[in-house]
Amino acid sequence: METVAEKFPFRSNDYYLSLIDWKDRQDPIRKIVIPDIRELNGGGCTDPSNEKDYTKLPGLQHKYDQTGLLLVTDVCGGICRFCFRKRLFMNCEREAVKDVSANIEYIREHEEITNVLMTGGDSLMLDTRRIESILKELREIPHVNIIRMGSKLLAYNPYRILNDPELVSVLSRYSTPEKRIYLMAHFNHPRELSDVSVKAAEALNNAGVIVVNQTPILNGVNSDADTLTTLFRNVSFAGISPYYVFQCRPSIGNTFFQTPVEQSYEIIQKSWKACSGLAKRARFVMSHATGKIEMVGKTAEHVFMRYHQAADPANIGKFMVFKSNPVARWFDDYRHAVSDFQPRKVWLF
C-alpha cells in the first residue's frame, strides 16, 4: 500500500472506512479507496480527456458551449483509486485556483454559458463561506441558470451536510425555483448509500437542491448486473436521479478497473430489466476528448454510437456505426467505421 501511495496518494476517513468488510479482500468499497498494487502496472495517461485543450484560464475549462467548468479545489473527501484527474493529487502543476475572479469574468463575458460546474477536487470540501462567495458571484450573472456542484461527499462523508446547517442554508438561498443548484453525486456501489447518506440527500432535497448520480462501470466494484440494478433502484428510491454511467477512462493506474465497452453496455442493459423507468434514465457515455459519446445499441457485428455532447457543436447528435470490437476499452479502439451501413430488412408477411 505504501509503495502505491507514494505515487498515487491515499485519502479517506473513519466513516467511509467503516463501510468496508475488512475480512473480504474483494470488498467493493475497499477497492474504491484502498491502494492496489495493480495501479503501478502501467498504461493510461494523466489527461485522458485532453482537458488541457479546453482550459481557457487556470481553473477554468470551456469545452461545451453551454457549460463552464470551475476547478475550485484540488482536495477530496477521499481519493478514488480510479480517479480520472489523478494528476491533481500527484506532483503535477496545480490546476485548481483559489481566486476565481478572472474565471467569473470570463463566464460573465460568454453569454452562451447557461450552466457552471463547480468541481475539482470536491466542491463541498470548500469552506461554507467560500462556497457562498462563489455561488453569490455566479448568481449575479443573468445567463447562468444552473449551478452544478460535483461532490462525492454524500458517499464519502455525508456528515459534511448533516453537521453544517449553514451549508444547507446557503445552498437553499441560491437554489431558487427558477435557477436550481444540482448536486452531482458519485455513488458507485449500493453499500455507499447508507442511512446517513439518505438523510443527507433528503436535507439537500428539502433545501431545493436537485441531486443526481453518476458512476463509472468499475471492474470488481459494480461490473455485474445485480449490483447495478440495486444501485439504480436504491438511488431512485431516495429521490436521486441516475444521470450518467461512464465507461472508466483510460487514466494512469486505471487499467484494471476498465471493462470492455461492449461488456459494459451489456451489463447496463441487463441491469435495467429489473428497473422502473425512473431508475434507468442514465446514459452510458465515454467522456472522450471530442465529447460525450453515447453507446446506444449493438448487434453481433456492429455497435452504434452518437455524440450526446460535443466540443464541436456540429457533431452533436452525429450517429456512428463501427464494427464490433469485443476487447475495445475506449472509443479510440474502434477503428473500423461503417459508412454504408444499411439495416437488415425483415419481412413480417
Task: List PLM regions with ranges.
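Conserved, mostly hydrophobic/aromatic
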Residues: 16, 80, 243
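Conserved AdoMet/S-adenosylmethionine-binding subsite of the radical SAM
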Residues: 101-109, 115, 124-275
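A C-terminal junction/extension of Radical SAM enzymes
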Residues: 263-305
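Iron-sulfur (Fe-S) cluster-binding segments and ferredoxin-like electron-carrier domains
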Residues: 83-95
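N-terminal pre-triad scaffold of radical SAM enzymes
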Residues: 9-12, 56-84
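Radical SAM enzyme core and accessory elements
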Residues: 1-12, 305-349
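Short flanking/linker segments adjacent to small metal-binding domains or redox-active Cys/His motifs
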Residues: 129-137, 293-314, 321
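Flexible, acidic/Gly-rich N-terminal and inter-domain linker regions that tether
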Residues: 1-63
